[in-house]
Amino acid sequence: MHQLFRLVLGQKDLSRAGDLFSLDDSEIEDSLTEALEQIKIISSSSDYQTNNNDQAVVEICITRITTAIRETESIEKHAKALVGLWDSCLEHNLRPFGKDEDTPHAKIASDIMSCILQNYNRPPVMALAIPIAVKFLHRGNKELCRNMSNYLSLAAITKADLLADHTEVIVKSILQGNTMLLRVLPAVYEKQPQPINRHLTELLALMSQLEQPEQYHLLRLLHVAAKKKQLEVVQKCIPFLIGHLKDSTHNDIILNILIEIAVYEPVALNSFLPMLKEIGERFPYLTGQMARIYGAVGHVDEERARSCLTYLVSQLANMEHSFHHILLLEIKSITDTFSSILGPQSRDIFRMSNSFTAIAKLLTRQLENTKAGSGRRKISTEIEFPEKLEETKLIVTENEDHEKLQVKIQAFEDKINAGSNTPGSIRRYSLGQVSKEERKNIRFNRSKSLAFHTMLTKGVGSDDGEDENRGDIPASISLSEIDPLGQGNDKLPFKTDTERSQLGESSVSYPNIIHIDSENLSETVKENSQEETPETTASPIEYQDKLYLHLKKNLSKVKAYAMEIGKKIPVPDQCTIEDTVRSCVAKLFFTCSLKGHYCLYSKSSFILISQEPQPWIQIMFLFQQSLFPEPLSIQSHSVQFLRALWEKTQAGGAHSFETAMMESTFPQQKDLDQVQLHLEEVRFFDVFGFSETAGAWQCFMCNNPEKATVVNQDGQPLIEGKLKEKQVRWKFIKRWKTRYFTLAGNQLLFQKGKSKDDPDDCPIELSKVQSVKAVAKKRRDRSLPRAFEIFTDNKTYVFKAKDEKNAEEWLQCINVAVAQAKERESREVTTYL
């Protein structure tokens, strides 16, 4: 042991203790273990708790030792001696004397804990420390327990198996009020499920007492437990989960757990279907998840299949959500399993209808017919299914109030020669019998029918026609064949391509801001946009319509304005209004118009929550009018829908929709500035940009195809360089670390430096990133002018770039990579479905 250590510790000389800091770290590094053993002897003496001199000497020496260990990176060499001193503290009183007054041994334990457990990423050190660490959880010192819980949570992230043997102790600590340790349980459950299962009922009872993050970790635990497929756990979980579905904070996570259970134990959810239906009606954005649960239960037997189909079909006709493709897949899966429900014509139902509403009506009628035992296959007086394969054609008849869709069955089997009996040949022959105009506007393919209806009602069109002659249903209703903006690769959003003969490309495409009942809207698409006015045919009533007259007078200005503003502010594909405690908010969905090979938003959407819905509604109204050559009237279905949205947001005494649109046709500049500022704050422009060439808003990858091919090569980094990192969740870690980061693939990785403190491998998984934001201006000071944050489900990171420009580059690249990772997940889900 170094001479000065021997003097200070041997004689307990407080006057010389400060001189230890004048020594170089390397000079005393070999003496640290021996010094720790000497401190253990001093602190274990009977009079230590009352001897202030000894306490001061020990505190100074421990501070010097832990500093030297950190600077010389020799924690593994001295870990055994540190843990030995730490363990000796358990033999003494650790409860505080009074408020904020720790005992002498609690101070030692706290200092050593910080030194040891900051090395949570070093398994050899943790193997020695964790058995001792968990003992401190029950020693009555709340501050020590809280800090210990933080460190154990860190250890669980990197080395959960070391904590698994202590699961029982951890669970008991949680039940005694140390709920911070809930974040550890999902990590240790895989190794030690039984101790958690034994106390699961007690853990669930804590839910109402927990903070939101802790509730989330408890639900994560249930999700992990559900995957283990243990019946006892399922029986405890389901009533608890159903009971908390009304909480909008977590109902999305809860439904994911129920979906997991439904895969292997659907019968357990059968009795809860009425309650799930009620929740689905209350929260329409959960419809997609509800559909998967109903779909799973519907596979149990035919009786349950019929019951579940009734709900699924009713939701298929509902235009207040955007999950129709999932509903169709679940309906198709059930009817394929129990083919007797719809009979041999089930395939025709999915292929012959041009709208979700029409399909729903056909299915409803057929379900009623089969339930009543009717053997006839007549669906309605207007739509009838033949015994043999037949084709349809659309005949549009005009009414003075609206245009109505009729489907006429055209039998032609006897016209087919013996050499053309395949379904593909029959379709080609049928198309050859209709006029040139009909041939351009009609395709008897399921995906084209879906795209056709949705383009008029929700802005969804066909992407291509490569599977036009396929007969299998799953391929023809695949999401990959639907273009949410109804555009081909070279279409302009504000124009009609009159040269295209494809159904999805010959129509005017516009975003999904309007839900229109297909029965009240013509589905014939003319070749020329000047003829395409299904909503704007003038009637005598319209000439008394003030909104119609106002728009007629200002039509050219409205179109010019919409064209110009469309380059600065994107128009959402879908808009819903949701009530909050204080007011209404608009939930806006944006997708890419091109949907190229590496598109970031072909299957997913960028979702924006706006506290100011009315400017968005006004922007959508102007854009809607720009799509038609004639003025819209107040009776137009699109206007009716927008008016309904407006009324939901309308304050008492405020202007009605038509009055507001007439008095202030164009949004005020301050409102537009606020909209743009909000888009910037949520980093919208990192992942979207207006393409002058295409005349449409496209994602980063579609706007930069030359970068997309490079970025998507395996291992090719999107950006790399040095950043300073700080983990802010644990306030006691205050150091910034400069590391070399690489953003590539689905991860943000950093290069392990010379410091042994750096973990070997702890990348940030981009698919788990919830948001990426610049540090809010109100939080910025001179030390954080270029900082940004990354939020995951269980951690927050803060980074500093070399300057603000570099920070912006990192922000954009990370946002692009996160969108790419989530899009990849969406594609995998779609493929699975």
Curated annotation (Swiss-Prot):
- Annotated stretches, region: Disordered: 458-505
* Compartment(s): Cell membrane
Q: Which GO terms describe its biological process?
A: negative regulation of SMAD protein signal transduction; negative regulation of transforming growth factor beta receptor signaling pathway; regulation of signal transduction
Write one Gene Ontology MF term.
phosphatidylinositol-5-phosphate binding
Region feature (Interaction with TGFBR1): 201-319, 663-833
What is the membrane topology here? Peripheral membrane protein
Chain ranges of the PH domain: 716-819
Q: Where is the composition biased (Basic and acidic residues)?
A: 492-502
Question: Which stretches are annotated as coiled coil?
Answer: none
* Gene Ontology CC annotations of this record: plasma membrane
Q: Which UniProt keywords apply?
A: Cell membrane, Membrane
The family database entries (CDD domains) matched by this protein are listed as: PH_MELT_VEPH1
Quaternary structure annotation from Swiss-Prot or TrEMBL? Interacts with TGFBR1.
Its family?
A: Belongs to the MELT/VEPH family.
**What is this protein's function per UniProt?**
Interacts with TGF-beta receptor type-1 (TGFBR1) and inhibits dissociation of activated SMAD2 from TGFBR1, impeding its nuclear accumulation and resulting in impaired TGF-beta signaling. May also affect FOXO, Hippo and Wnt signaling.
The UniProt comment on domains reads:
The PH domain is required for membrane targeting.
> What protein am I looking at?
Ventricular zone-expressed PH domain-containing protein homolog 1
- Native organism: Homo sapiens
Gene label: VEPH1
